[in-house]
Amino acid sequence: MGEVQREKVAVIIGPTAVGKTKLSIDLAKALNGEIISGDSMQIYRTMDIGTAKVTKEEVDGIPHYMVDIKNPEESFSVAEFQERVRKHIREITERGKLPIIVGGTGLYIQSVLFDYQFTDDAGDAIYREQMEKLALERGVEYVHKKLQEVDPESAERIHANNVRRVIRALEIFHTSGEKMSDQLEKQENELLYDVSLIGLTMDREMLYDRINLRVDIMMDQGLLEEVEGLYNRGIRDCQSIQAIGYKEIYDYFEDRVSLEEAVSQLKTNSRRYAKRQLTWFRNKMDVTWFDVTDGEKTSEILRYXEGKLQLKSNNSK
């Protein structure tokens, strides 16, 4: 029997503000592709500026998926992301197009590409409610500390403000006696697709300057008003507003900090997140990195993807 043909998928990863969006559009045009967002926060409607969603002008006719599919008060899991994205990959492939995942959120992308099994077996609604109550009464740091005690690897990977994932990891340990980190390590480490993993990186100081500038531009574009709209709708304690760009401005509306302090914290958190993104991708995935410090490498990256996936670009026809 011949080997089953695996679906071809291009994946563009890298830290925030490095230039993934433009590259993804350029590759989609050249390789007859359609784009799937690999960002866990771009799924939320009305959260456009803070999540740096692709604009109507930038889209330039290229279909985009996994954007604006949930309301901000709704929750969203890695398992649901995995299911939806794999469905999009099938459908895009069936149309004779190339799926291009762009992100973003390391665990989410990894869950799609590798044989991660998410089941409802490890679930305890009563325990989950107890942990949620603890998080509200004693703070997210308290619950995160409990996770550090039983599963330090997951605690290192999951930020304290990501309360849902912290509690999920605790719930898995509570019900199965196994660490979430151990469960993930045990799972099959083989790619499910024929993947071209493209990573963008640049000089750290330049990246940090770009991040600071991006925050200033977001404020000019109306980030304050965008967050105020969510705040005035009464959206509190939701997964969506834990996103960088929202929690900092929420602190301003809660009179915890001045606007200047909120913007400064947003820049700091964005830079830290970029560093965490790079660390994650370098440790968890076999990525071919392209340094774009001195400018775009679109032609070079296009040649690499053509070769890796054995494709012919529209540019070479």
UniProtKB/Swiss-Prot annotation:
Residues 39-42 are annotated as: Interaction with substrate tRNA. Pfam families: IPPT. The record marks 105, 128 as: Interaction with substrate tRNA. The keyword ATP-binding applies. Its cofactor is Mg(2+). Keywords: ATP-binding, Magnesium, Nucleotide-binding, Transferase, tRNA processing. ATP binds at residues 14-21. This is tRNA dimethylallyltransferase. It comes from Bacillus cereus (strain AH820). The lineage of its organism: Bacteria, Bacillati, Bacillota, Bacilli, Bacillales.
